[in-house]
A protein has these predicted regions:
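Short phosphate-binding loop-to-helix
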Residues: 63-85
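Short Gly/Thr/Asp-enriched flexible loops that form oxyanion-binding sites at enzyme active sites
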Residues: 101-112
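A contiguous pocket-lining binding segment that forms or flanks enzyme active sites
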Residues: 112-145
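Long, charged alpha-helical interface segments
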Residues: 133-210
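General beta-strand structural signal in soluble alpha/beta enzymes
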Residues: 9, 28-30, 49, 64, ...
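Structural motif
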Residues: 9-13, 95-96, 202-204
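N-terminal beta-strand-loop-alpha-helix module at the start
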Residues: 1-57
Length: 210
């Protein structure tokens, strides 16, 4: 998935980057995510936030100071910035855990925000990856746990192949977690939705096939 990607480093739990950004990528440090960048020798192209977590705006040549009272979270503002610059793949680190569980939920919702704009986002935790798809499909390869949730009302045409529990052209809703506690059962698995959006979680050792 390398090439022209936007990395967003937030203030939640951070366990290092799975891939190293290259010159065509864009790295945004959101608030206290700047400290993770500094400690891990990651050079951000942009630092933004209201800096309520960091305490003060850092000394950086490209800082955007946001107001404390605003509609966008720092992460959402970072996503909007990346979209405006033409990036379609978003790798979000430091977006889970931390002291604010509300921000974890907000960041999961942000994956749907990205998918609604025909882009893809991945939210990395210590042992898992979260992503969202809309009216599309993904292929997974590897071993481990997988979970699939409807995150936006009703999802139709949901097909799960290559998993322990499969579905074929099913309809699932956001008020019942039918897709929890699944796992890879074949070398490759496919998750598809023809009408709606899905939130997908898979173990960190599982990869997506292009």
């Amino acid at each position: 998935m390398n090439g022209h990607e936007c990395y967003i480093i937030g203030a939640g739990d951070f366990f290092g980057l799975r891939e190293i950004p290259d010159d065509s990528d864009y790295v945004i440090a959101a608030d206290a995510g700047y400290e993770y960048c500094r400690k891990n020798n990651i050079i951000p192209d942009l630092v933004l936030g209201d800096f309520d977590s960091l305490g003060a705006a850092p000394k950086h040549p490209n800082v955007v100071q946001l107001p404390v009272e605003k509609d966008d979270t720092d992460t959402v503002f970072a996503i909007k910035t990346g979209l405006e610059k033409g990036y379609r793949h978003f790798y979000i680190y430091g977006g889970l855990g931390g002291k604010r569980s509300d921000h974890t939920i907000a960041n999961l919702q942000s994956l749907l925000y990205i998918a609604n704009r025909k882009a893809r986002g991945w939210l990395f935790g210590e042992n898992c990856v979260w992503t969202a798809i809309k009216n599309s499909s993904i292929s997974l390869k590897g071993e481990g746990s997988v979970a699939v949730f409807c995150f936006d009302g009703i999802a139709r045409g949901v097909t799960l192949k290559g998993l322990k529990y499969e579905l074929n052209n099913a309809e699932i809703s956001s008020d019942f977690p039918i897709g929890v506690s699944n796992s890879m059962a074949a070398e490759e698995a496919t998750i598809e939705v023809t009408d709606g959006a899905l939130l997908v979680m898979y173990d960190i050792g599982i990869g997506e096939e292009n």
